[in-house]
Structures are given as C-alpha cells and as structure tokens.
C-alpha cells in the first residue's frame, strides 16, 4: 500500500505536464 504522500506526489507529477500541455494547446488554438 502506498503512503498518501507517495500518491499525492504521483498525481502531481502526472497532472503538471498535462496542465502545461493543455494550456499550450489552448494558447496555440487562439492564434
């Protein structure tokens, strides 16, 4: 069983690149 800290870290590592990619896609879509 993973510790809560490990789960949170894994989620953060997975979400941050996704959010950055989404923001980049939205910025490119505007132009």
UniProtKB/Swiss-Prot annotation:
Any Gene Ontology CC annotation: photosystem I
Subcellular location: Plastid, Cyanelle thylakoid membrane
Chief subcellular location: plastid
Biological processes annotated in GO: photosynthesis
Segments passing through the bilayer: 7-26
Pfam families: PsaM
Membrane topology note: Single-pass membrane protein
Keywords carried by this UniProt record: Cyanelle, Membrane, Photosynthesis, Photosystem I, Plastid, Thylakoid, Transmembrane, Transmembrane helix
Family: Belongs to the PsaM family.
NCBIfam families per UniProt: PS_I_psaM
Protein's UniProt name: Photosystem I reaction center subunit XII
Provenance organism: Cyanophora paradoxa
